[in-house]
A protein has these predicted regions:
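Buried hydrophobic packing segments
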Residues: 30-34, 51-52, 145, 149
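Catalytic-loop motifs flanking and including active-site residues across diverse enzymes
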Residues: 26, 30, 95, 141-145
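Surface "functional belts" at beta-alpha junctions
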Residues: 41-140, 194-197
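DPxDG-like acidic metal-binding loop motif
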Residues: 13-42
């Protein structure tokens, strides 16, 4: 239509992980290509930050959990200080049972959000301090991710699309298997294996 812009957006933001390795690569690659082609700013937001902001306010500790397969979850801890959401512990990968035991020993109320609660829920049945969040909080919402990106946008701290990479937290199974296969051949191993998305 004459006079109308085909792509009327001026800013892009996307979750940068952790999560599915393939999903992160596809999503990140798409966002980077769009930002580069349209010459607009691109902001990356940790998936955990968006999940935590699904809960508008609570005095409880928020534990975001994303399924990491093989009985593990990606987890991060948050708490509100007034209206400000603060990261209490940066994302890490841990066995679900170990995470529950650790939080139970703190004797404080914790609410879990994210798709990883399917691994947590059976471990916290009838626990009055470890609470499974409402199902509506299990998936990151665009509005919650935008709230997390807002300070970056206000400060103009966008990323160079060519330099932005996903937050994997741990190496992929393919990298682990490659290292195991070539452990006797140092020339085949990289000191810091990475995946570049362009």
């Amino acid at each position: 239509t004459p006079g109308r812009t085909l792509f009327p957006y001026t800013t892009l933001f996307r979750s940068s992980g952790p999560g599915s390795f393939t999903g992160l690569r596809i999503g990140m690659g798409t966002a980077k290509a769009m930002a580069y082609a349209l010459q607009i700013p691109l902001y990356g937001v940790m998936t955990m930050d968006g999940l935590a902001r699904n809960i508008p306010y609570t005095t409880d500790t928020i534990c975001t959990v994303i399924d990491a397969q093989k009985k593990h979850v990606y987890a991060a801890l948050y708490a509100y200080d007034g209206e400000r959401l603060q990261v209490k512990e940066e994302p890490f990968v841990v066995e679900a049972a170990s995470l529950v035991e650790r939080l139970r020993n703190q004797h404080k109320r914790v609410v879990f959000v994210g798709d990883g609660i399917k691994r947590i829920a059976p471990l916290v049945e009838d626990d009055e301090l470890l609470i499974i969040g409402d199902p509506i909080y299990r998936i990151p919402k665009a509005s919650s991710l935008l709230l997390s990106a807002r300070p970056l946008i206000e400060r103009g701290e966008s990323a160079d699309p060519m330099d932005m990479v996903p937050h994997y937290i741990r190496r992929s199974e393919a990298e682990v298997l490659w290292e195991e296969k070539h452990k006797d051949n140092p020339a085949m191993l990289k000191e810091n294996p990475t995946v570049t998305v362009i």
